[in-house]
């Protein structure tokens, strides 16, 4: 438990209800680490809303101010800012709105934009950084957002600064998409073990 092994960083994923958010806030107030990453999961890949409006409002008013980094994708950023995003300029505008709401740092993920490359934008009150990477087309992309926020939190826990943690996290997820493995039919997960080398004698 967190009482026994103190966390160096915390990653928070989908929060379905106001009660869950209240419990999370209470827990965060008890721990010392400020390296908290929130992935505000709100919309399924098909566009279905996963969180009710009461929870979204409570998250905006109470939780997002407590985290070091918020990592919305474009549909989530649109919900949080009540704007439409069609370009990098729109992403920056949405990021500035989130900063004005009390967010310390926001990484808006640009994978939903129609382009040959992905532009992920990291903003705070002082700086704007754009991470540009090649877009890999694959049906196996389940878990990209969750994996990215987890990778960033992991790098933060290892002592990396925020910029480096985001950079390494983005590169990790890109490689996991690029090297994906097919599991059965339909959309599968990214390859989280892409950096591992498997000894030939264990391969069938």
Predicted segments with their positions:
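Conserved N-terminal subdomain of the carbohydrate kinase-like
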Residues: 1-45, 49, 196-198
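Short, small-residue alpha-helix embedded
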Residues: 79, 138-162
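Short pre-catalytic strand/loop immediately N-terminal to key active-site residues, enriched for Gly-Thr
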Residues: 128-142
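Charged C-terminal helix
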Residues: 163-204
């Amino acid at each position: 438990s967190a009482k026994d092994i103190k966390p160096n960083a915390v990653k928070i994923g989908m929060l379905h209800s106001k009660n869950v958010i209240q419990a999370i806030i209470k827990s965060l107030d008890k721990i010392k680490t400020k390296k908290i990453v929130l992935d505000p999961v709100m919309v399924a890949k098909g566009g279905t809303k996963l969180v009710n409006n009461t929870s979204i409002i409570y998250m905006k008013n109470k939780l997002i101010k407590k985290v070091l980094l918020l990592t919305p994708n474009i549909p989530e950023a649109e919900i949080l800012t009540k704007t439409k995003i069609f370009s990098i300029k729109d992403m920056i505008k949405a990021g500035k709105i989130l900063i004005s709401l009390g967010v310390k740092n926001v990484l808006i993920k640009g994978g939903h934009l129609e382009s040959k490359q992905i532009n992920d934008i990291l903003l705070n009150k002082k700086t704007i950084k754009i991470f540009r990477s090649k877009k890999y087309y694959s049906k196996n992309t389940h878990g990209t957002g969750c994996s990215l926020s987890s990778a960033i939190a992991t790098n933060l826990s290892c002592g990396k600064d925020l910029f480096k943690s985001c950079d390494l996290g983005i590169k990790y997820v890109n490689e996991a998409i690029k090297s994906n493995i097919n599991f059965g039919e339909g959309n599968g997960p990214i390859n989280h073990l892409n950096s591992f080398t498997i000894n030939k004698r264990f391969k069938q």
